[in-house]
Every structure is written in C-alpha cells, then in structure tokens.
From Swiss-Prot:
Listed transmembrane segments: none
Organism: Saccharomyces cerevisiae (strain ATCC 204508 / S288c)
Taxonomic placement: Eukaryota, Fungi, Dikarya, Ascomycota, Saccharomycotina
Primary site of residence: Golgi
Complex and partners: Interacts with MON2.
Modified residues (Phosphoserine): 244
Family membership: Belongs to the DOP1 family.
Molecular-function GO term, any one: identical protein binding
Entry protein name: Protein DOP1
A GO-annotated cellular component: cytosol
Amino acid sequence: MSLPLKPLTIDSNNKQLDSKQKKFRANVERALERFDSVTEWADYIASLGTLLKALQSWSPKFQNVRYYVPSPYQVSRRLTSSLSPALPAGVHQKTLEVYTYIFEHIGLETLATECNIWIPGILPLMTYASMSVRSHLIELYDNYILLLPQTTLRLLIRPLISSLLPGIDDESNDFLPLTLKLIETLQENLDDDSLFWQTLFLVMTANKGRRLGGLTWLTRKFPSLNAVPHLVNKIKMEAEENPSETETNDSHLDRKKRKEEAFKVLLPAAKDLVTPEPGLLIRCLVGCLEDENDILIKRSVLDLLLQRLRLDSPVLNVLITSEDKKLLIMSCCRTTLSKDMSLNRRIWNWLLGPTAGGMLNNNGGNSMEYTTSVKSANEESNVYFTKYGLSALLEGLSDLLSEEESVLTAFRISMAVMDRWEIGSLVIPELFIPLLYSSEKFKQNEQIMKTARTFFDNTETNIIWGKLFQELEDIKNLKILDFVLTNFNIGNDEEIIVRHLPLILLTLLALPSNDKDFDNIYKLQKFSLYNKLLNYIPERALLPLSHSKLKHDDEVSCEELLAKIRGFYTNVSNPSSILEKENIAERLPPFTTEDLTFLIADLIQKKLLSSLWDLENINESSKLFIAIFEKIPESEELKGRSHISWSDKKITQSIFEAIPRLCESNNDAKSEEIVGIVEIFGNYLYSRMEFIESMKLLKVVMMAVWKSLKDPRHQILGVKNLKTLNRFIPSKFIESALVYTFVEEEDISERLSVLDLLWTQLDSDSNLIRRPLELILGELFDDQNPFYLTVSKWILSILNSGSASRLFYILTDNILKVNRLEKERLDERDDLDMLTYEFQMLAYVLKTNNGRTRKVFSTELTSIKSSTIWKNEDVSTYKSLLLVTLMRFLNIKSNTHAKSIRSALILLDILLDGTEQNFKDIVIFLLQMSSKYIAEEGIEPELIAVSLLDIVSKVLRLSHDNGIKLDIFDDNAAHLKYIDFLVTSVSNMKSPLIVTAYVKLLSESIVYFENSIFRMILPLSASLVQCVQRLFLLEKREGGYYQPIALLLGGLEELLEISHGYLVTEEREGYFSGSNLKGDFIQSVVSNVFSSDSSNEESKIQGERDVILQSFRQVISCCLDIWYWAHNISCKSNDDSSLDATNHNSYKFKFRSKKLLETLFLLEPLELLENLISIRSDNTTVTLVHVLDGNKPAITIPHLLYGVIIRYNRTASVKFSNRDGSRSSTTKLTKGEPSMLKRLSGESIIAFLFNYVDSVENSAMEEFYGDFLLFFREVATNYNLYSDVSLSILKLVALISGKVSKTQFGEQKRVRREISDVFFKYLPNAFINFTNLYRGHPDSFKDLEFVVWRVQYIVNDQIGGDKFNTTLATIVNQCLTPYIKPKSEKTIPGYVLELAAVVSHLGSKVKSWRLLIAELFQNDKKLSVIGSDQTWEKIIYEWSIYPENKSKILNDLLLEIGSKRSSVTPTLITFNLGSDSEVEYKCQNLLKISYLLMVSPNDAYLLHFSSLISCIFHYLVSKDIKLKGSCWILLRVLLLRFSESHFNDYWSMISYCLQTNLQEFYESLQIQSEVDPQTILQVCKTLDLLLLLNMEGFTSTNEWIFVIDTINCVYKTNSFVALVDEIAEFKDYEITKTDDLELPTTLKDGLPLLRGIHKIERHTQLRSFFQNLSYLHYEKVYGLGSVDLYGCGEDLKKDILS
C-alpha cells in the first residue's frame, strides 16, 4: 500500500497567502540563498541561525491553521548538507536545533506524512556524531522519530535500525544504555517483532558496518532457538498416546506438521525470528562469518550458535532448507581456515554438541570414571554430529570439488577437520576418493597438488589404502592408483611400503580381467602399476618362499584372496568400525608376510605363463617376474636355486612351446617379445635348471635371437638380447649356440649381415665374435666359392670403417695362441694343423680386394703389448709382427709338417713388397720357395655382373695410368650402348655389390668426359637421383638400403665436383685447350652422341652453367628429402626408446646426405641456399644451414645478401668479404645469374635471412657486421629499387641492431653510429609507398611493431630522445596517420591499432602522435565508433598519462563544461546555459570525461574527484534534461572508478538528486506532462547500479526512499513511500505492452537489471523495471550475490558511446 508523497511543486505553489506568510516565505528563501555563498564551517552556523530565525518568523494564529515549512525539499537538502561528516560538531548541534524546531512545530502527523523529506538527513548522523551531538540526537529520536505512527515506523524500520546500530557497536560507550533503550522503544512501538527481527537480520546481512552493533543487540536480546526439553518430552508423550495421528502419506502435509511440531518445542519468542523467512537468520550468521569481518564479530556469532542455536535445533533441522543448513555449516568450516584457536574451538564444540564442550572442561575426579565419561562423551558427540551435521558437511565439501577455484578450499577444510578426530574420522573416509579425483582433474594447478600432498601425508594410512582398495575392486580404476603412486609421498612412509603396498599389489594381481571394457584399460596400465608398486616395496616387506607353508600346486582362489583383503580394510578404514574399536595399528593383516610373499610370486608366475601362452606382454611379465624374485630374500642354503615348494617346470615348458610360435609370427610387436624370454632364461632359469636342459633351451632361445639379428628392423634388439645372455651365461656356451645358428643359416648374405652387426655393436674384446668370424672367413679358402666376393667386399667395408686393427688383432692373436714362439723345437703337443688353418685364413684375407687389405695390414699399428719374447725386434705394425712370427716359425728345425710350411710361405709372399728392411735376407732364405693361385670367374648372375664391371673399371684405370689408347668400339652403335648403359643400368640396381662396382666404373669414366660432360651430366645425374629416390622409398618401407644409397650419393658427389671443376676452368680461360685432350674411346663416344656447335663462346658457357645448376637442383632436392626424413626420425627417437634401431640408421643417412650438401655448398653456396629456401623455408632448414656452414654466419650471410641485391639492382658493385677474396675461387661465381632468379623472390630470401640471423648467437654479429653494413648502404643509396622490400629490410635492420646492442662489439661508438647514420639516410624514403604496398596486409604492421620496439637500438638513442622521436614521428606520419585520420569514415583495422598501441607506449614525446590522438579524442563521431575497442582504450589511456596531458586533459574538459573546485561541501554554482549547440558540446565533454575515467585504473583521478562530483550535482538539480542524462552516466562512472570511502560526504546529495528526479517523473505522470525517456532511463540505471553495488552509505539509510527495503517487498502488506514502487502503481504501468523491456528475473550474475539497455522510445517500456526492482534487489541480498564489476563497466561504456 503506497502512501501519498508531498509534491515538489509545493515549493512554488500559488495559493492565496496573507502578507505575513509571504514575508515568512521570503525570509526562508533568503535564508536558503545564504547557503550558496558558504565557504567555511562558521558560515554554516550563521546560515543555520538565519534559517532558524526565518522559520521562527511566523506561527499560525488560529487553531485551524497549521504550521508549515516553505520549500521543504530545499530546506531539508540544506539541513542534510549541514550534517556532513566533514563539518564540526558545532554545525551538527545547530542543525539538530533547527530539526527540533521543525519537528516540534509541524507535529508528528505531518512528520509522518513527510517522513521522506525530513528523516533521511538525520539517519546517517549516529555513525559519526560526537559525544556532545549524540545526546541531542538521542533526544530527537526519543521525542519525535520513534513516536511516529506504527504504519510509518514499519516503512522506516530498516533505515532506523541501520541508523541506531552504530550507536551500540562500542560497549564502553557512555550512550550505550540510552541507544539500546531507543532500539527497545522502536521494537515496542513497532509492535511487529517478526518484522523487527527479519529486518535486523537483513541489515546485518547487507551492511557489514552494522554487524558489530547488531551482535551487541543479539547478545543481549536473541532468544534461544534450541528445543525446550520439557516441551520435547511432552510432544513425545502425545505421539505415544495417539500413534495414528503421527502417520500420514502426504509429504506436503507431513512437512507442514513437522514445522508445527518444531514451533511447539521452541520458546514462544523464537517464532518471530524465523517467520516468515527463516533463511534471513542464516544469511545474517553467514555474513558475519565472512573473512572480511573482525574476529570479535566471528567470535560473537559462534558464541550465539553454541548457546542459542545448537546444531540439533529444530530451526536448523526442520524450519530451514537443507541448502541453508549446508551454507551455515560450510561458512563455519571456512572460518576454521583462519587458524584461530579461539574460533576453531567454538566451531568444533558447535558441531559435536554440548557434551564436547563439557568434556573439555572436565578436570579432576576419579581417573577411571573420567576415562569412562570421556569415552561415553566421545560416542555421544559422534552420534550427535553424524545425526545433525555430517551429511550437510559432506554435501558442502562435495560441491566444492567441481570447480578449480574451490578445490583448494575443500582440501584445506578437510585438513582442518582432521584436528578433531571425532569429525575427521567420519568426514575423511567419505571424501578421500572424491578429493583424490579432483586433485587428479586439476593436477596442472601446482597449488592444488601441493595442498593435496599435504592432505595425503596427514591422512591415516588405513583410510588411504582401504579406500583405494575399494575403488580398485568396485570400479577397477587403475588411473587413480597410478596418480597416487606418481604424485604423492609414498616411499618415505614405512607403514605404507611395508604393510599396505604388498596387499595392493596382491589385489591388482588377483583382480579379474575378463571384462572386455576393463581389459583394454587393464592391459595399458597394469604392468606399469605392478612395477611402480614393486619399486616402492622394500626387501624387508617380504620373506623367503621357503618360510611359507603354501606350495606351488595349491589351488588359490582370487575371490577368496580379495574377500580377505576386503575384510581387513573394512575393519581398519570404515568410520563406524574406527569409532567402535581401539588400537587400529595393532590389528592383524589378512596374511602373514611369508604367505603374502608366496601369493604375490605365485600370481606373478601365472601372469607370466598366461603371457607366454598368448604371446602378449611377455617382456612386461618377465620384467615383473624377475623383479619380484630379485626383491624376495633368499635363504642361505638355497642361493640361486628354487625351494622344493616352488616349481619352474611350467615356465620352462612354456618357453619351449612359445619360441617356435614367436619365430613363425610375422608380427613386429610379437618379435620384440623375445626380450622377455631371454631375460627370464638368463636371469632366472639358467641357474635353476639341469645343465643339459639349460643347453637345449639356450639353443632354442638363440634361434629366436638369430631371427631378430637377421631382421634389419630388429637388429639392435637382437644385439641387446645377446648381451643379456652374455651377462648371465658363460661366453663359451653362448658362442657355441651362436655358431650352431650360423651353421644352420644357409644364406651367406644373412650371415654376413649378422656378423657385420655384431662387429659394430659388440665390444672389441668380446669373444662371441671369434668363431662366427672364422666361419665367415672360411668362405675365402676357395676363390671359386660363389660367396668369395661377398666376404671380400665385407672385409673392404671393415677397412673403410677404420676397424681393421680389430680384425687383424683377432687373426694374429689366433696364430700367436697356437704358435709358441719361444720354442726352438716342436713336440706332439703342437697343433700344426690348426696353425696351418690360421695361416691360410690370414693369407686369404690379405689377398682380398686387390691388395688393399694387404696394404692396410702393412701399415696398421699393432695393439699387442711388448714382451720379452720379441727381444729387440720391430713389431710396431701387424706386417712386421707377422714377419717376425713367420721367420721364427720357419726357423724351427724339426718341422716336418709340409702343409704348415707351405701356408707360412704363401703368407710371407703376400706380405713382401720390397720395402722391408731385411728384404734381401728374406729373399735369399726363401729363394727355393714359390706360390701360385688361380682366379676364375663366379657362376651366379649377380657375381658375373660385378666381375664384368670390375674388369671394365680395371681396363679404364690401367689405360689412364699408362696413357694407352683404347679403340675397342669403332661404330656409333657401340658408343651409344655404352652411354645408354651408364644412364639406364642404374635404374634396376639394388645390391650393394653391384652398386659398388658401378660407382667405381663411373668414377673411372668421369676422367674421360672432360668438356663433353656438360652434354651428358643432366641425364646421368637424373638417372642416379631417380635410383636414389627409388631405393630411399624402399628404405622407408623395409630398411636395409643404406649402403647402396650411400654409394650412389658418393658417385653423385664425385660427378658434380669434377664437372663443376671443368666449368670453373672454362669460365677462367674462356676456352678448352685442345692439345691436352686424351683421345680415348669415351671422349669420342660423348662427342659423337652429344655434339653441338656454338657460335658464341659466352652463351655456350652460360648454357653449360645452366646444365650444371639444373643437375645441382635435382641432387639438392633429393638430398633434402633424405636429410629431412632422417632429421625427423632422430628428433622422434629422443622421445621413444623403441626407435633406437631406426635412429641409428637415420644418423647414417643424415651424415651422408649432409656430406653431399656440404660439397655442393662449397661449390655453389648461393645456388644451394636459394634452392633450400624455395623447397622449404622453415626452422629445420635454418638448422641445416647452420650445419652446412659450421655455425659460421659470415660464410652464409654474404651470399644471401648478394641474392637479394642481384634481384633488385643487377648493376650493383657491392663486394662482400667472402664472395670476393677470402674464400676459394669456387665461391665467387658471379658471372652468371642464379638459376632461381625468377623463381624465388627477394622477399622470401630476406624472410629466411631474418630467421637465420634470429637463430644466430649475439656474439656472432661481429663476423658479418661489415657485409651487412655494405648491404644496408646499397639499399639506402638505391632506395627506389628496393621499395618492394623496404619493410622487410627495416625488420632485418631492427633485429641485427637489437642483437648488436647486446654485445661488447656493439658498445663501440663507431659501430653504433654507422647503423644510425645509414638508417637516417634511408628513413625519409623507407615508407614512401607504404600505404600503397601494404594496405590490408596485417603482417606488414606486425613487422612495423617489431621495428618500433627496437628503434632505440637502431638510432642509438634512448626512448624519448631526438633521434628516437624523429623516427617514430616518421612512422606515425607515413604509416598510421592515413588510417587514423579523424575525418576518415573507414573502420580502422585491428592490426593498425596494435601498432598504434605499441607507439602509444613509446611516443609520449612525439608531437605529431600526441596531436593525432588529441584530434581524434576531440572528434565526437570518431570517438563513439572507436571507443568500444579495447586496444583503443589502451591507446587513449597511454595518451592521457603522458606528462603533458596527465592533469591538463581533465582540467580543460572541466573548464569547458564550466565547473570549478568545490568548497568544504558540494555547493551550487550557477551555470548559464546557452544555446542547444552549447548544451550538446557540454554533454559531449561530460561523456569524454566519463570515457577517460573508464579507460583509466581506479582512483587514477582522485585529485579531481571533488570537482567532478560537484559538477555532477550542479547539473542534476538544474532544469536541463540533456545535461542531466550525461551527468547520470558520469556519476555511474565515478561509482565504478572511485573507492567507496570517497563518497562518504556525498551520499545525502546523491540521494537527494535521485529522489528529486524520480519524484519529478512521478509528478509528471500524475499531471500527464511530457517526459524525456532517455533521462529517466539514465536515472533508473544509476539507481539500479547503486543498489547492485550495495554501498553501505547509500543502502543503509537511503535505500528505503527508492525501493521497499524490507521483506515487505515480497508481500507488500505494510505501507511504503518507495518511489520506484509508487511509480509502478501508476495506471500506465498496469498493462503489459509488446514493447516492454525483457529484463532478467534474477541478479545472480552480478549485473544490473537494465544491463544491455541503452535507449528506449517510451518511459512505459520500463514497466518491468519499476515493478520488479525492489523484489529482485531483496533476492540479490538474500542470495548473498556478488557483483560483476567488469560486466558493469562494459555496459557503462556502451552507454557512454551510444
């Protein structure tokens, strides 16, 4: 029910007045005018005295004429301003004197009707009134305000309570009894205890400044809300007497009845506190427990809870909702986080009930009785908490686990409740797993993980592992166990690792895995978990298997095992069990240690047997099996053997059966499973098996190892297996098994491949390789053997790899072992047949490879240690050592073994070459001896082909060496066939043998091509490249093609190197010297096939150059493919150990391709670099270039710079250091153009150059600085030619300047000056065509940003220096101004703004920039368009804080509006408003001020606050509608951008402006005059924001004027004067219209009700706002809602700019 409001127009009514009244009115108006000129507090007293005299100048003479106050709103406003906190007590005293006079004369009835005019000014005074003022104020309350009618008191109840509570917040206050008496009087006069209490709770919830006073009142007056015992007993007796009445099926009726019963057991006074809304009490208590409150407030609230609102109160368990109860309990628990013991003790006692508090105070008495009572009290407390608090606490904590922000709180509360065992023992078991899951979910948050670890360490271990066991058994979630083992402190807790982890391991092993869904997860995680658990379990947690009475053939049920473990953990971790029993630590585990050890080992063995049967996870199973047996202690008598209770037969049998199946499988994954079998056999079974059985099994295992040794994809795996066997089994047995597999293998290439692998992978002192080596070398004994050539080529590869010494050592060591050199006579113990064999073997080895082996043998230094047996003889090389050995052997007199002598002589013949020191003596001694051997061709096609190629090669070499002319072919058909053979034959080659021979032939042939090579190099190189690519594809699919690819790349390298040499010679000499040509058959072949005439020598040379470069391009592309592939694999292998073999291979490919690229780089650096850039210009290529130039940028950069110059200025004469002098002649081929000239842009080269320089270390800048400076000077001189790439060049300059500045070299004045000088020469022309070239190119502006950040390094000047500013000004004028012209209508792209934002950081002293932004800020249209952009906000803010602008901008805007600084308090300044354009201008300036404040931080313009708010008040009480709208916006900006404390002096004026504006609108509705909807919208939005922000100065004592501020807003049973609700009752707002605003139904999101509404057509569209504001604001306070300040700010910005 709304009350009528006194209209504002009463101030200027035109009713008939007599002369005395007119004089009375005039006196009052004159007195009011005096307030306009006050400057200090004394003026206020004088003005108030004048006002009092004016009010006393008339009194009614007749009883029917009542006293009145002229212009009551104006008088009230002046009185309110006189009660400002800034004024002294004397002014306040005088003001109260005036108030007293007015109240006394107008009477209570008039005061009640005009309460909205007179009461608001008095209400805030109690908060800051001095002692002298307070007594007068109390009298005013006592004599007038509190005597108002009940209807008035009901609408004033909240502001009155708010105004009186500050008077009782200090209990030492002298006026405390009087103020308490006032509140009692208020409650009594109100005659509505329910409304009183509900409003009190609302005040304490919304206004934190009133909470201390509120608690003072509650402590004295709050009735107990606990159940009264005798009333409870009475209800119980009634229920027992009438059992039928207690039963009902209707839940609603049942709930209603329960509430009625709850009220029956409470004190009568308690009902008023919880009706109609019990939730208000809870919110009041919760609000008082928030962190922001003083500790005294929290302590008082907790005392209230303990004494008058226990946890078992019917209010908490019946009358309020479960959500409210949860809210209260969680607030209490959050309070424990402050770790104040005085608070925590109260909270625990409240949660545990009255017995807990008594228990703490119980001292003395009989100890036995005391112990019993404590135990009883404990049990009672637990029952109490379980019944009344546990579920709410658990639910509240669970709610916290869903959001990352609140998980930390949940952990901390959980740790806090551990302090009270009675609570913790109930809460932690229930929450442990959910807390773990939440920490796993947010494990990236370091703070959460740190807290989770602390929580884990503090939790009782039985609870941890009991709950984890339950989770494993019920949900089979291995992930959470893995998370615990990985992230928490497990290893340092003795109880965990000894007692619990073995049980958890047994649980995991016993869990069934037949469920398909579970099985997939299980397979992924189980072995990892087994190993993690085993790593933690110490040896002392296990006992020898022999100690257990269990046997391997005992049937053990996994279900039984799990049931026993379940029973154990149920006992030790279940809360109910914990409470019932004592001595948890002493409870027995489900198994003895010895039985537990046996069960774990038994189940792991079953896992292994299962894996061997399925051929899956054998490696993991075996690793686990070995790990457990390494961990289990062994009895002394059973060292290395199994106890009789244990059997390994099943494992042995399973391995015998599994290996053949593994060997038959073609699955790569299965092939790797052999590792586990090898590990089991070597590390476990071998020592426990019978010898014969172990040898049988070793042979079978070696067959599987042999298979992996043969497979190129698993060779490294095979070697690893071999090494594993060698670690556990004597070498002689392994060697025997290995030789067996060698003999069984029929394919010589496979045997050789394995031998080569073992040669490279096994240690040089390994004996495993000797016997297989002898078997392979045995193939050399017969040169007609089809495998002879294969073995000899392998020996050649050994020589090439640099490991010949190892081969020679083995061969000579075998001879020395048999031949005892110190003997002069032979006896029957000497094995001459073996010696003969060793002699023959070495002889056949030395005969291989056309004497190459012999040559290396002759020069290779021996590694055999010196000994006395050698005396003074030379044994430094293997040749000299063997010569000494042979001579000694031949000198033995009694040797009748002709075969051994003959073998020695053959070997001697091979070694002798005439260079020996004792050559003559040897020849004389062996004069009668000779040796012969016969060489015949092979029989297989491959070997025939190789032989043919070798013959041709040999003929070519010999003819060249001896100058012999070969005229084998006479007709052109033969010539063509030869060339065609070279080009086409390579296309089908695969075998390394054939490729080796082909490359050798090619190498011999190149010598004869000479100048004709230019006509055949292209098809020849193309054919070679195609072959490499074909083999490379096979390599990627199958592997094993490294050798032929490497040989072909070597051939290509030689071909290109020699052909390029001919080109260089030709370019130097201009022609070939014909007299030096060798007239051989290849020359004539090439000339006949590719003859061509050239009329012009120069064009001929250019054509030849093009051919060479085209070949280069093909080879570069091919090499890059190989290098990139190898590089990617080597990168991946760092993360994946399974790629070891592939990685080993990739390094070989990478090295070989790099070697060829290095050669090409030496020959044609620029050509190679440009091809690299065109193929792939990324960071990998930059890495490759660093590899090629050896991390010496001075080699690479000049070529790249030259590549740029030649594309833009071919006539340039720049001479870079390494292109013209310092390098060999091959690096300065500048006669011809690069082949990529038209296919690769200069922009691309500069982009690559930028990335390359960026990757170079700063210290390397000095190396190429001179070349870079030459380049920059060239660009600056011919700027017009380089205009297309000017920005890229500037970016490069910026990068280099930045890097140079960070070096010692860059500290030299010359260096810093040189770049700066060239830059300033270039700067005026660098951006001439910028807008044309780069319009719409975001990247170009990113590049400019890069440059701008580094300008200080380029110009060698500090930020703000003259050079720096000049550069920035140029960039602004030429690059930014065309886009940011204030008069331009086009939208400014985001990338331009990003650059502008960078300039704004650095350009505080750049005049053109400052003027540009100033002009834009002054342009109203442009600002409204750009202002909403966040980047623009940063720019405007940066501009506004420049030293020249910081205070000037706001001062200028205020000056233009016409404001001036306020005096002691806000006063009115007269503004003469002119034309509409002037008003519009002022509006725009007000909005600019608003925008400027919004883009600035809070309190940035604090010095201007007084002027700003004064300006606002002046216009808000004026008549200008448009200015009012802008001022309301500015007021909202101040509310968001300045701290609440700065408004303390101004709340009354803010309230007055809001009140008068809304009341004018209200009266306009009544008389149906015209209303400006936009102004009303802004007024409403301001009120909306004020209510949302809940600023105490406004809401506590002024809110009631505008909205219904009590629970009456819901029911509206009491009268009200709230303007918003008064307006809502107007008839225009009764009918719903289609254009009504759709407003939200809640304020939970923290945004105003009118968010997003910036313009309306009619005021009636606000119908929903007026009707719902009071209720929604009440709901927001009730819901303890927060405020979204950012969202409010964004909405306000749209108001400013719309």
